[in-house]
Amino acid sequence: MICFMRKASVVITLCFFTSFSQAAELNHSREYARCMGLAPSDPNDAYEMATAWKSMGGGDAAEHCAAVALYYSGKAEYAARRLEVLAETIIATPEFKGEILGQAGRAWLSHGDALRAEATLTEAAKFLRGRPGILVDRSEARAALGDYKGAVEDLTNAISVDASKAEAFAFRASAYRYLDELGKARADIEAALILEPDAAEALLERGILFRLAENKDAARADWLKVLELDPDGEAGRLARANIEKMDVNVN
């Protein structure tokens, strides 16, 4: 549910190559774009590229790409640690430090350390002054810690700034469900699906709400749709598990 590189890529590119003399030349800018573009699809090659580039003066930009490559290679803990160090040592604007910390927090979430993620994202939020994306990410960390009221607070604040994102409504619906506020959960999930009718996370959550209301046919329909939309993702995995659990309970 977390997009590691969302929102920040343009800001990061501009900041690296307007703020740091060691990476100010055009060839470094091209290396950064190449390295970051390679990281999601071939993280091992991107990491090797970043390491070699850093030895030739790539500086903080090369270090950033190395950390991102570690994340995409499944080494989220190492990525998070390097991103935290980078955010601490880099000479940059507060907003840019916040972007790097936000990526570190998302990496901690992927690693499964919700406590560290919540702390890191809280620090990022101080720099980013309540930017909605950071609040949505921190809400997920808080929910993982069982702090559903805190998650609702973050999501409500995020929605008050930008009410156009289906995921914020879907996540808040889930938090409301855990707080046993099912009416609010249903209202949020319908809002999410108005914004994005094929949002897998929202359909997954609506299916859960249907199951709680004993409407098993509707629940199954939503979960089967999730499997069509996201067969190999986390939403698909959870939809499959819910169908299997429901079938076992029926039998």
Where are the regions that the model predicts?
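N-terminal leader/linker segments that initiate helical-solenoid repeat arrays
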Residues: 21-81, 251
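Helix-start (N-cap) detector for alpha-helical repeat units in TPR-like alpha-solenoids
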Residues: 28, 60-61, 94, 98, ...
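Residue-level recognition of tetratricopeptide repeat
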Residues: 35-36, 68, 106, 140, ...
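Register position in tetratricopeptide repeats
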Residues: 40, 72-73, 106, 110, ...
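Conserved structural position within tetratricopeptide repeats
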Residues: 52-55, 88, 92, 125-126, ...
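Canonical tetratricopeptide repeat
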Residues: 65, 103, 137, 171, ...
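Terminal, low-structured helical/coil segments at or just beyond the last alpha-helical repeat
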Residues: 212, 220-251
